[in-house]
Amino acid sequence: IVIGDWSSDVCSSDLVKELQTIPDKISRIIDDKERLQWFASKQANAKDIFFIGRGIDYAISLEGSLKMKEISYIHSEAYAAGELKHGTISLIEDGTLVIGVLTQPKLYEKTVSNMVECKSRGAYLMGLTTFGNYNIEDTADFTVYIPKTDPHFATSLAVIPLQLLGRSEERRVGKECRSRW
């Protein structure tokens, strides 16, 4: 909440109020886990999964990739979306699963542009964004929505579906999860 003291744009009492809504928003995400299980079953043959994002969404991508590797033992990597053109794009082939994280409104269009590049190479796209960003459905093959929140707390919500996806993949491939949920 110290952020509120640093920024004239952010009121600390508003941040406290928003922070108090996070547990309910996490519950709503978990209530939608069957959609992620369905999606995981459709991606049953994925051998490589790439996560892309910009800014803080890149950090979310790193966490999603780590959870995918830790939980399901499926090869995954996270990349800064703007760096795809520097060789990484050559790893994308027909059917490769690419998960684009789009929680930062100012970076949304640029990340969508990178997702379009991946799709042109045959990638199957999953978008992870907030409710209301329905334009992503024009690009992504599957979209997961998280409740709207202050951008300071988007990471707290965005990692939940990625962890659930990793857990669904873990069950699909028959690996035992080493951590308890």
Give the location of each predicted region.
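Anionic-ligand anchoring segments at beta-strand to alpha-helix junctions in alpha/beta enzyme folds, i.e.
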Residues: 42-94, 124-125, 133-135, 164
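Long, non-coiled-coil amphipathic alpha-helical linker/lever segments
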Residues: 15, 22, 26-33
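Glycine-rich phosphate-binding loops that contact phosphosugars or nucleotide phosphates
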Residues: 7-21, 54, 101-156, 164, ...
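Generic recognition of flexible, low-complexity loop/linker segments
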Residues: 36-40, 86-89, 114-115
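Structural signal for conserved beta-strand scaffold positions within catalytic alpha/beta enzyme cores
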Residues: 28, 78, 100, 144-145
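A short, well-structured juxtamembrane/interface segment
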Residues: 29-45
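Single conserved hydrophobic/aromatic residue that forms the stacking wall/gate
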Residues: 1-10, 170-181
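Predominant activation on well-ordered alpha-helical scaffold segments within soluble catalytic domains
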Residues: 23, 27, 62-69, 112, ...
